[in-house]
């Protein structure tokens, strides 16, 4: 059972994977989250009228910062020298939600999936924090990996 779970040793104990012998390759990962809210709250966000400030700029910076701190938050993640982190937030007015997409890149020995997922998650939590006075019913949903490239396991793309 543990042979496919790289974070478990032969005794079933959690450990950080040794990536020392792996080749350095270009690696990317893209993740997505949605933040669902009332139409009224979305209008306030879109107009830039949230009392706490610019929701988009604050969430974007929070997501970037979170990607850089991923190894401090998730115990078995390796500290990485990210070469690029982007966080894009778009309004989907027809669905009363924001779509948050994060992309992380590096030239390294391990992937950046957790960094992209963490960036999306923290950006979404930041939107919630900034808007909770307007709407207690905000829902963060469908956080998922959209794609990953590079590494021994190759490329992967989510399909709906």
From Swiss-Prot:
Transmembrane segments: none annotated. Its EC number is 4.6.1.17. Keywords: Lyase, Molybdenum cofactor biosynthesis. It catalyses: (8S)-3',8-cyclo-7,8-dihydroguanosine 5'-triphosphate = cyclic pyranopterin phosphate + diphosphate. It is an enzyme of class 4 (lyase). GO terms for molecular function: cyclic pyranopterin monophosphate synthase activity; GTP 3',8'-cyclase activity. The keyword rRNA processing does not apply. Coiled coil: none annotated. Pathway: Cofactor biosynthesis; molybdopterin biosynthesis. GO terms for biological process: Mo-molybdopterin cofactor biosynthetic process. InterPro entries: MoaC, MoaC_bact/euk, MoaC_sf, MoCo_biosynth_MoaA/MoaC, Mopterin_CF_biosynth-C_dom. Substrate binds at residues 76-78, 114-115. The active site is at 129. The keyword Nucleotide-binding does not apply. It comes from the Bacteria. Homohexamer; trimer of dimers. Catalyzes the conversion of (8S)-3',8-cyclo-7,8-dihydroguanosine 5'-triphosphate to cyclic pyranopterin monophosphate (cPMP). Belongs to the MoaC family. This is Cyclic pyranopterin monophosphate synthase.
């Amino acid at each position: 059972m543990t042979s496919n779970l790289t974070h478990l040793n032969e005794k079933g104990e959690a450990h950080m994977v040794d990536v020392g012998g792996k080749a350095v390759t270009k690696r990317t990962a893209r993740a997505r989250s949605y933040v669902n809210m009332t139409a009224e709250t979305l209008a306030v966000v879109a107009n830039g009228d949230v009392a706490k400030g610019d929701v988009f700029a604050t969430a974007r910076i929070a997501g970037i910062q979170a990607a850089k701190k991923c190894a401090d938050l998730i115990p078995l993640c390796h500290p990485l020298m990210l070469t690029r982190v982007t966080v894009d937030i778009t309004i989907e007015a027809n669905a009363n939600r924001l779509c948050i997409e994060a992309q992380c890149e590096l030239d390294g020995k391990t992937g950046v999936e957790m960094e992209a997922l963490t960036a999306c998650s923290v950006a979404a939590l930041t939107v919630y924090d900034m808007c909770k006075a307007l709407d207690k019913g905000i829902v963060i949903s469908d956080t998922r990996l959209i794609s990953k490239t590079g590494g021994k396991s190759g490329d992967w793309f989510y399909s709906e």
